[in-house]
Amino acid sequence: MDPQQQFCLKWNSFSSNLAITFSNLFKSDLLADVILSCDGVVFKAHKLILAACSKKFADLFENTPTNGQCVIILEATTPDNMAALLEFMYKGEVHVSQEALNSFLKSAESLQVKGLSTETGRLAAQQAQQHMGDLSPLDSPTGRRSVRNSLSGGSSSIVPGGVGIGLGGGATGANSMSGMGIGNGLSLAGMAAGGGMAAAANAAASSLSTLAASANIVDRCGSAGANIISGSAAGIGGSHSGGAGNGSGTVGIGGNGVGSGGGNNGPISLGSGAGAAHHLGGSTGILKQECDSLMHPGGSSSSSGMGYTHVPPIYRPINYEPPRKRAIVRSPYSEQEQRGSVLRDGSKSSECPSPINKPPYHRPSSSASSTAPTEADTMHSERASPQSSRYENHSPSTTAGNGNATSSLERIVKSERNNGSANEANDDDRELMDESTDNGAEDLRVKLENLKYSPPPPPNSNTSSTTPNTLLENLKADGTLSSNLAASIAPADMLNVWNATKMNNKNSVNTADGKKLKCLYCDRLYGYETNLRAHIRQRHQGIRVPCPFCERTFTRNNTVRRHIAREHKQEIGLAAGATIAPAHLAAAAAASAAATAAASNHSP
């Protein structure tokens, strides 16, 4: 191992820990070593924090002895402002009302508190001026643009040491604009005529953006023919009016304000503080158009009459995106609905224009108008119950010629349970949801009917005989149904028990676990409606599905199929024979055995 090797140990929570510690020290007077007195009010503080946050306190503590506590009397600061300043220095933020904001900022300026005084802005401005002075005119894009424009109509030069006072002038001598502030800075003087003035204006705009960023200019307002950038700072202003004609223009970077006026003749002054005001006119129309496009992106320039909809990259925000055309996206629900309607009746659907009016799991009921299922209904049932189709596809009773009669009886019984209502979907949406999710709710004994059953002749024109109740009664009266099948079908009053007493708000009970559904005939509570329906069918209606191989009965068809596949594998194998037979023959033998067992169980 190299003895010169070193490990860097870093604490990621160092800054946050210091901030929390300073906040705790502000709340308590622990380890305080300096006393601040303001109009008789005493504040205890720490020299280290005061010196770190205030240049004036740092200079004061360097010149005072360090033995014992020291007392500092502040005459020009009120107790409220001092308390707010201490909170700002210890926590980094403070809430000040609008009325006390001016006096608070003056106190911070006198104590040179970092983050509140303009000393930071002055230092940033000086560094920017030194950087601009070190660069040659051709090193920056502004300098190259100035030289290019000066070749067409004028010349410009950089003169350090100028005094920038807020002076501005218009082309006609009638417009005037006052700037804020005075101070030593950078002066750009040039013989400007036409393009030369535009170059000076471009240089002024570049300097303005740099100084505005350092001075934290936040308030912007615009007017026709002029853009005003305003801030809060103290300074000295002035006004100047220039005459028309070609002459020399001066650009000065001065104190705490920015004021600029432009024409073919007149000085333009830029300040380095937080306030700014510049009037654009004459040959500075391009810069004015860019500013107007920033303030009004959808409009055009008000003075030049030229439409300018493109936002320059320098004025674009961070999250700017160019406008794009809206793309038309077709909903997948409409395509699915159209495909489903074509499968049903070969025409487009006009019953449900959107998935909001009709859920995707909706299955139209055609029991009141037709006794034979359509192809779309058969496909829908196979998709909804893949497990049931696994057993039914190999059954002779469903693949024989009387399969349509079996399906019609299933639909009759199911429609009877739904009270034979064609508009049941509008009355109770939960009935539809349970119909789509409850795979195998129909009685298995209907499927295991006699193989020699033939469908009844179509009814007459009498509409009353097409209802499920009437059809079922006619089948029983004609003796078409076998005795065991007719006995297995529950009476109409028992089949209608659920629809006769539909669930309403009175059936729900609020418990500690939430809202529960209460059975209409007993005190059992269920969290889901499907479980309550199964309970009513099993306990109160007596509808149960028997196993064809044993004595057990079940509530749902899926449960019977899983039970047969799990418990009666050997019976299915014995029924198929000792020799190896194809899979469809074994399934047919198992279905025949199940039908025989069901018939024996239902015989009196």
Swiss-Prot record:
Residues 425-437 have a biased composition (Acidic residues). Broadly expressed in the developing larval central nervous system (at protein level). Expressed in the larval lymph gland and circulating hemocytes (at protein level). Expressed in all cell types of the adult testis stem cell niche but not detected in somatic cells of the adult ovary (at protein level). In the testis, expressed at high levels in cyst stem cells and early cyst cells and, at lower levels, in germline stem cells (at protein level). Pfam families: BTB, zf-C2H2. One of its GO terms (molecular function) is zinc ion binding. It comes from the Eukaryota. InterPro entries: BTB/POZ_dom (IPR000210), Dros_DevTransReg (IPR051095), SKP1/BTB/POZ_sf (IPR011333), Znf_C2H2_sf (IPR036236), Znf_C2H2_type (IPR013087). Disruption phenotype: Inappropriate morphogenesis of larval mushroom body neurons with early-born neurons adopting the fate of late-born neurons from the same lineage. Malformed eyes and head capsules due to defects in eye progenitor cells. RNAi-mediated knockdown in adult cyst stem cells and early cyst cells results in the appearance of cells resembling ovarian follicle cells throughout the testis. RNAi-mediated knockdown in adult cyst stem cells results in loss of expression of the male-specific isoform of transcription factor dsx and leads to male sterility. Residues 364-374, 461-470 have a biased composition (Low complexity). It is found in: Nucleus. Keywords: Developmental protein, Differentiation, Metal-binding, Neurogenesis, Nucleus, Repeat, Sexual differentiation, Zinc, Zinc-finger. Residues 384-409 have a biased composition (Polar residues). GO terms for biological process: eye-antennal disc development; import into nucleus; male somatic sex determination; mushroom body development; negative regulation of protein phosphorylation; neuron development; positive regulation of actin filament polymerization; regulation of stem cell division. Gene3D superfamilies: Classic Zinc Finger, Potassium Channel Kv1.1, Chain A. Residues 32-98 form the BTB domain. Its main location: nucleus. Required for morphological differentiation of postmitotic neurons during postembryonic brain development. Ensures production of appropriate neuron subtypes within a lineage by preventing precocious generation of late neuronal types of that lineage. Acts as a downstream mediator of the transcriptional activator Stat92e and is required for the development of the eye-antennal disk which gives rise to the adult eye, antenna and head capsule, for transcriptional repression of the Notch receptor ligand Ser and for the self-renewal of cyst stem cells in the testis. PANTHER family: BTB DOMAIN TRANSCRIPTION FACTOR, ZINC FINGER PROTEIN CHINMO. This is Zinc finger protein chinmo.
